[in-house]
Amino acid sequence: MELDALDRKILEILLKDSRTSYREIAKDLNVAVGTIYNRIKKLEDSGVIQAFTVKLNYESIGYDLTAIIGIKAQGKKIREIERIIAKDKRVTCVYDVTGEYDIIVIAKFRNREDMNRFVKGVLSIDGVEKTNTHVVLEIVKEDFRLEP
């Protein structure tokens, strides 16, 4: 979908705070509330906006450990393995990638024991050949909100 300047401005506002009311957006952009409603509805219907959500501080709710896990898998099993892993609530991202590993997973854990159980569970999935786990020491930037 091609975005015009108004669509982009609406998205920028919603990316900063998805709770911003249509009335506030309309006032900021000097357009009618109905225009904002229609534009946001169009953005939702076309799949540009997939959800209105919050950005959590995971450490504040007990997820103190972030890991990046490379997974080498048998070619025919990759999609199935990705689907299984994606169902785990601790997993934030599953990527099908090129390179030494076939799958990259980013996940949040409460502690090392929780991570250890997860990795051993991944290794028990049929078709997983090996994993390589990197523990994140410090999150410098973690923000998936790209400017439209």
Curated annotation (Swiss-Prot):
Keywords: DNA-binding, Transcription, Transcription regulation. InterPro entries: ArsR-like_HTH (IPR011991), AsnC-type_HTH_dom (IPR000485), Dimeric_a/b-barrel (IPR011008), Tscrpt_reg_AsnC-like (IPR019888), Tscrpt_reg_AsnC/Lrp_C (IPR019887), WH-like_DNA-bd_sf (IPR036388), WH_DNA-bd_sf (IPR036390). The keyword S-adenosyl-L-methionine does not apply. One of its GO terms (biological process) is response to amino acid. One of its GO terms (cellular component) is cytosol. Residues 22-41 bind DNA. One of its GO terms (molecular function) is sequence-specific DNA binding. The keyword Repeat does not apply. Residues 3-64 form the HTH asnC-type domain. Disulfide bonds: none annotated. PROSITE patterns: HTH_ASNC_2 (PS50956). PANTHER family: LEUCINE-RESPONSIVE REGULATORY PROTEIN (PTHR30154), TRANSCRIPTIONAL REGULATOR AZLB (PTHR30154:SF34). This is Uncharacterized HTH-type transcriptional regulator PH1692. It comes from Pyrococcus horikoshii (strain ATCC 700860 / DSM 12428 / JCM 9974 / NBRC 100139 / OT-3).
